[in-house]
A protein has these predicted regions:
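Repeated loop/turn-to-beta-strand initiation elements of outer-membrane beta-barrel proteins
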Residues: 60-66, 104-107, 141-147, 173-176, ...
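Short glycine/proline- and aromatic-enriched beta-strand/turn motifs that initiate or cap beta-hairpins
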Residues: 19-79, 295-302
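Outer-membrane beta-barrel "beta-signal"
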Residues: 163-167, 233, 283-304
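Outer-membrane beta-barrel translocator/channel fold
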Residues: 71-84, 181-261, 279, 283-290
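Residues that define the transmembrane beta-barrel architecture of outer-membrane proteins
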Residues: 44-50, 85-91, 123-129, 158-162, ...
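Residue-level signature of outer-membrane beta-barrel architecture
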Residues: 56-58, 99, 137, 168-170, ...
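Membrane-embedded beta-strand positions of outer-membrane beta-barrel proteins
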Residues: 26-30, 66-70, 109-111, 145-147, ...
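Transmembrane beta-strands of outer-membrane beta-barrel pores
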Residues: 30-36, 70-76, 113-119, 151-155, ...
């Protein structure tokens, strides 16, 4: 068993991971909502969502780690009050490097090519290209600061997200905070060996190519924007396997459909620069979100 863990440590450990003492190899999320009313009619729709995040870091040497994996997401919801339920989503590859410069500074760059569409047919508009560049300053074993930039070639135009955050673990290892604003934030407290309670924030702006969303609209895209706030319980079946049950609420949520060529010059998290686009559908209300998450984690606390 000791030989097994030593091999696993050599494959998966890096300065990026050791700062947190674990790596989440698999995260699987299943979400649903109650019915949400459209603004312009009595029609209602649910939002069903499935996400998977697989991460495989491979240590090349003491200072360099290869980062690989993939992201998958699928949505089922109405985009038009009088329309059918539409399926759309994305598949993205993760390929990057993590470089340790010295005992304090660590850099990470990850390429994120993806297909984002309804997968009805294939075209160049299905493809998007993203990159994340991140620097981390390790203040102590339990504290580091992070800053960087995310870019993606969204269908509405180039999208830039400056990022800043931190990771903190209390000395008794009961309180943990992992923050990367404006994209996500998480804080949790270990109540018992088997149970953590926490709060979580996720903010996203993404776009997906649509084919024939209605008979009169053959070439469009949907821009999804949401801010989600959750409270959750995490059940720790073992050091590796966990289940989270989350209840949350969405703020400023929308799934807005635009003509394929209706774009802006570029976008930032809080604004878009360029001409005002013509929204083709109506929004529906914010509301509750229920989510269950399975996590498979490799923890190095006891195996160094």
């Amino acid at each position: 068993m000791k030989k097994y863990w030593r091999l696993f440590y050599l494959i998966f450990s890096s300065e990026l991971i050791i700062a947190q003492n674990y790596v989440d190899i698999l995260k699987l999320n299943l979400s649903t909502t109650p019915y949400n009313k459209f603004d312009t009619s009595s029609s209602k729709t649910k939002i069903n969502q499935l996400d998977a995040d697989v991460t495989i870091p491979i240590k090349l040497n003491s200072k360099l780690t290869l980062l690989s994996g993939f992201l998958y997401e699928n949505f089922q919801t109405k985009l038009f009050a009088d329309g059918p339920v539409k399926n759309f989503g994305s598949i993205a590859l993760k390929l990057g490097l993590n470089k340790t410069f010295n005992e304090h500074w660590i850099g990470t760059m990850v390429l994120l090519p993806k297909i984002a569409s309804d997968f009805v047919s294939r075209s160049s508009n299905d493809f998007q290209y993203g990159v994340v560049a991140l620097m981390k300053y390790k203040k102590a074993d339990h504290l580091n600061y992070k800053f960087g930039m995310y870019y993606n070639s969204e269908l509405f135009g180039p999208f830039f997200v400056p990022m800043v955050g931190l990771y903190f673990l209390s000395e008794n290892k009961k309180f943990e905070a992992n923050i990367m604003l404006p994209l996500n934030a998480d804080a949790n407290y270990k109540l018992t060996k088997f149970l953590n309670a926490g709060i979580n924030f996720n903010g996203q702006i993404r776009s997906y190519h649509l084919n024939h969303v209605t008979p009169s609209l053959p070439h469009t895209y949907v821009a999804r924007s949401t801010n989600e706030f959750y409270a959750y319980l995490r059940f720790n079946f073992s050091e590796s396997m966990m289940l989270q049950t989350k209840c949350g609420i969405s703020v400023a949520r929308n799934f807005r459909v635009y003509e394929e060529n209706d774009k802006v010059n570029f976008g930032l998290p809080a604004t878009f620069i360029g001409q005002k686009r013509q929204q083709l559908n109506s929004d529906f209300s914010n509301g509750l979100i229920f989510q269950a998450s399975f996590i498979y984690r490799v923890n190095f606390n006891k195996n160094k």
